[in-house]
Amino acid sequence: MAYFALGLATATKNRDGKIIEAFFPTPILAPSDALVAALAPIAGYQEGNQALDITAAQSAQLAAVFAAHQQAASAAFADKAANAKQPLVLVILASDDKPQSVAEGYLKLQLISHRLVKPHGTVLDGIFGLLHNIAWTNEGPIDLPELAERQIEARLAGRVLTVDCVDKFPKMVDYVVPAGIRIADTSRVRLGAHVGEGTTVMHEGFINFNAGTTGVSMVEGRISAGVVVGNGSDIGGGASIMGTLSGGGKVVVSIGENSLLGANAGLGFPLGDRCTVESGLYVTAGTKVRTLDKDGNQVDIVKARDLAGVSDLLFRRNSLTGQIECLANKSAVELNSELHKNN
């Protein structure tokens, strides 16, 4: 049978012995049947989607199996994990179903951030309710109900426990830093973000989980959950893209290739290739738009959603009438290559 994914992780457990987060440095997409069959008797895997606790001795055995099946990175990690002080867990996903455990959820998020699957490339239904709300501290992740006691213990021991954030999703770079990217403020890119090679995320840029860029992009605005930005597109400073989580929306908002969402602009419908939304203009799916011909004459008045995915369009607000207009985009967007030299 075809398996979806697997990965060995070091995990953090709370005082109830429940896993609250897991670090998969070498996730494997579409593992071979032979690899799963060799891992199964060691880990006690039977069938379906399982998260299995692994001992140090088992980890050493797993290392040999990974090596025998040409999974060098996983073999090296499993070999080191044989001396780990942290709990270990092996997750095997026979099928791509909604995650049933924290470990499964973390594996799926890391599949995206490792660029093994694209946003919407794996089922994440229910993950928000599955994950724990965690205090991410200088001493690692702490389950929120345990934070106050840990702070007291640290102070009495002469230490200060610093809380960087309280969230269900950690920052991506604590788990993986994909090749060829720059992130000015790492706290603004969540685990589960897909950051394409050549992407720069500036200080005010933000990328949520199950969202991101596919290639070279300059991100100075907000890419909400579920949003995908195509290669060569630019998200201007303070710009906002509506996510599928907002208002229970079902439409997947996306931006095609070589498009520009201007500074402080907003988008609530799928934009095609080589499109421009002028600075300060927020276009939602229901916005009424005047379409113009090449001579500036009105052709029709439509809702923006009717122009979803159409390429080579310029959206602007008429400064005299206040009406939103759409016409052919005559200037292609080109990102400044100098800004991406060090990626």
From Swiss-Prot:
| Active site, renumbered | E220
Q: Where Mg(2+) is bound, by residue?
A: E204
What are the protein's UniProt keywords? Acyltransferase, Amino-acid biosynthesis, Cytoplasm, Diaminopimelate biosynthesis, Lysine biosynthesis, Magnesium, Metal-binding, Transferase
The answer, when asked if Cytoplasm is one of the entry's keywords, is yes
Q: Does the keyword Acyltransferase apply?
A: yes
* Annotated GO MF terms: 2,3,4,5-tetrahydropyridine-2,6-dicarboxylate N-succinyltransferase activity; magnesium ion binding
Q: In which pathway does it act?
A: Amino-acid biosynthesis; L-lysine biosynthesis via DAP pathway; LL-2,6-diaminopimelate from (S)-tetrahydrodipicolinate (succinylase route): step 1/3
Q: What does this protein do?
A: Catalyzes the conversion of the cyclic tetrahydrodipicolinate (THDP) into the acyclic N-succinyl-L-2-amino-6-oxopimelate using succinyl-CoA.
User: How the protein assembles, per its UniProt entry?
Assistant: Homotrimer.
Q: What is this protein called?
A: 2,3,4,5-tetrahydropyridine-2,6-dicarboxylate N-succinyltransferase
Question: Which classification does the entry list for the species?
Answer: Bacteria, Pseudomonadati, Pseudomonadota, Gammaproteobacteria, Vibrionales
